[in-house]
């Protein structure tokens, strides 16, 4: 059986926000300072909005750390991860500069991005990094050039596949150099495999859509701060992260073996104060006006929690692309016939067996090449069902003296609120077994 808790690493969504808050506190964030949620921040034509703005064009107004944690206000976390109040344009005046590495160093301290050491096969998860972003963009460019090879390259260059792949590797390596558009054009001409009238177009695509995007940007900081982007952690890691938080940012290790012992912590006084501030903010999530208040109303123990939803990209695949396009081609690309698509797919598989080993990929490429419309992958998949998001809830209880850390992730959970009842039942059962009512 596949052990989902140990092996499936996915985005944590807003459950990562306590890490961002810890990093900001360590740099000098005043948790009582209220910052204005202005709805969204526009960067390079892209909107980075709070969910409230995205859903209803409303904002949370002024929020401090407790309010931002309670309402899961993205805008606030964009601010504190950047050390800037974007609504007013004023610096937050931190004692130390906050960077992406500051946030990631706290994530590492809490056990994210490394194996827990549990007595099972497990994934190490993924911490975002600039090099990881570069690798991802290089792969995307490679996939684009391979898929569109007949559009960009001379026919003669495509015949010798080994030589073609060597030249493709050269293209990708240029991303590691700070080349001007003119320099890229010159290099493409020197290699001599690109269609002459496509050289400038390809050079612009490589530079502006890929090479210039490889360094970390402000947008990456925004995504990093709210648990989106390249974050990927297992449920076990998230439970370990909560346990470390409840232990003053100290990791005690995870094990399947039940054992007794006392909780130990060598955390500094400043770290303990920062952790206490974070747990207080997380307790607001289950308190009056918090998103989980209805679920925990009347619960016998105080609970510090954070919910999160991470979107899984892509679509639920049909049995085969052939059957899918046979059914929907007339709506997706009415200017071509299904028989033309099949014929073109067969040609692609015969001509490029190294690239099109399966019919599904060839069918998709055939539709894109034959249609006169400027179709995208999104257009091709428009009649497929999307995956629902991953639903997360992480928690500590009792909040004033944590004894248990819980992390629940539901695949296709859709909403984080679907994971929270599971957390409630686990904490309640554990508290009952340990007779917390006599202690707290």
Question: Predicted regions span which residues?
Answer:
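Beta-lactam-recognizing serine transpeptidase/beta-lactamase-like catalytic domain environment
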Residues: 1-14, 22-404, 408
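Short, gly/Ser/Thr-rich active-site loops of penicillin-recognizing serine hydrolases
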Residues: 262-266, 424-440
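Amphipathic oligomerization regions
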Residues: 401, 411-430
């Amino acid at each position: 059986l596949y052990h989902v808790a140990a092996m499936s690493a996915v985005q944590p969504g807003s459950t990562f926000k306590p890490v961002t808050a810890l990093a900001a506190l360590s740099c000098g964030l005043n948790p009582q300072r209220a910052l204005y949620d202005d709805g969204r921040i526009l960067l390079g034509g892209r909107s980075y909005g709070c969910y409230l703005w995205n859903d209803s064009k409303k904002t949370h107004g002024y929020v401090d750390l407790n309010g931002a944690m309670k309402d899961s206000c993205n805008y606030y976390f964009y601010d504190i991860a950047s050390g800037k109040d974007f609504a007013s344009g004023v610096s937050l005046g931190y004692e130390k500069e906050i960077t992406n590495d500051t946030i990631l160093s706290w994530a590492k301290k809490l056990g994210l991005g490394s194996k827990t050491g549990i007595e099972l096969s497990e994934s190490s998860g993924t911490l975002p990094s600039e090099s990881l972003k570069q690798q991802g963009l290089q792969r995307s460019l490679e996939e684009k050039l391979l898929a569109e090879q007949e559009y960009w390259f001379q026919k003669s260059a495509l015949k010798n596949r080994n030589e073609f792949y060597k030249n493709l590797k050269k293209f990708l390596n240029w991303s590691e150099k700070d080349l001007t558009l003119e320099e890229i054009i010159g290099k493409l001409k020197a290699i001599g495999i690109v269609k002459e009238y496509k050289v400038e177009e390809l050079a612009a695509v490589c530079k502006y859509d890929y090479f210039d995007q490889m360094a970390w940007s402000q947008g990456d900081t925004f995504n990093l701060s709210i648990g989106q982007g390249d974050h990927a952690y297992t449920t076990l890691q998230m439970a370990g992260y909560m346990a470390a938080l409840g232990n003053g940012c100290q990791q005690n290790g995870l094990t399947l073996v039940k054992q007794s012992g006392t909780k130990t912590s060598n955390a500094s006084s400043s770290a303990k104060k920062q952790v206490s501030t974070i747990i207080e903010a997380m307790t607001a999530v289950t308190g009056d006006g918090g998103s989980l208040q209805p679920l925990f109303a009347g619960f016998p123990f105080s609970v510090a929690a954070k919910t999160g939803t991470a979107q899984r990209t892509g679509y639920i695949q049909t049995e085969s692309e052939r059957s899918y396009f046979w059914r929907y081609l007339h709506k997706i690309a009415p200017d071509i016939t299904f028989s033309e698509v099949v014929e073109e797919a067969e040609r692609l598989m015969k001509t490029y067996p190294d690239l099109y080993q399966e019919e599904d990929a060839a069918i998709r490429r055939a539709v894109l090449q034959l249609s006169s419309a400027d179709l995208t992958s999104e257009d091709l998949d428009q009649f497929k069902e999307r995956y629902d998001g991953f639903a997360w809830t992480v928690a500590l209880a009792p909040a004033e003296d944590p004894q248990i850390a819980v992390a629940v992730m539901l695949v296709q959970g859709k909403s984080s609120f679907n994971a929270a009842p599971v957390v409630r039942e686990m904490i309640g059962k554990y508290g009952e077994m340990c007779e917390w009512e006599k202690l707290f």
